[in-house]
Amino acid sequence: NLIQFKKMIKKMTGKEPVVSYAFYGCYCGSGGRGKPKDATDRCCFVHNCCYEKVTGCDPKWDDYTYSWKNGTIVCGGDDPCKKEVCECDKAAAICFRDNLKTYKKRYMTYPNILCSSKSEKC
């Protein structure tokens, strides 16, 4: 769920998730349209696509099982849908970490109105 996702992001990046990512670029936070502004925004685009593929549970609200082993997220549990959501969140948190060097403060609260180009397909 979103609370678990926030914890993953915080641990992976050291950044405060809501402040740093909830309104970043054209795809972080709710919805999304246009072309991703940079690699971090593309992480959100891919994460949104990942959530769209999930069926049988609610990615934003259903709890899943995960643990940390040697700084790595390990998704577990018996529910395949919830495990898939965990894998989506894990991939996004890793993507954010891997793109910290190109994170741009100017995209932190990017106005959605500027995301007007044609949306990419998943």
Swiss-Prot record:
Family as reported in the entry's similarity comment: Belongs to the phospholipase A2 family. Group II subfamily. N49 sub-subfamily.
Source organism: Gloydius halys
Organ and tissue specificity: Expressed by the venom gland.
Matching SMART domains: PA2c
Entry GO CC: extracellular region
InterPro entries cross-referenced by the UniProt entry: PLipase_A2, PLipase_A2_Asp_AS, PLipase_A2_dom, PLipase_A2_dom_sf, PLipase_A2_His_AS
Ranges for region Important for membrane-damaging activities in eukaryotes and bacteria: 105-117
Keyword Secreted recorded: yes
Name by which UniProt lists this protein: Basic phospholipase A2 homolog
Molecular function, one GO term: calcium-dependent phospholipase A2 activity
GO biological process: arachidonate secretion; lipid catabolic process; negative regulation of T cell proliferation; phospholipid metabolic process
Subcellular location: Secreted
Lineage: Eukaryota, Metazoa, Chordata, Craniata, Vertebrata
Keyword list, A-Z: Disulfide bond, Secreted
Disulphide connectivity of cysteines: C26-C115, C28-C44, C43-C95, C49-C122, C50-C88, C57-C81, C75-C86
Keyword Secreted recorded: yes
Pfam families, A to Z: Phospholip_A2_1
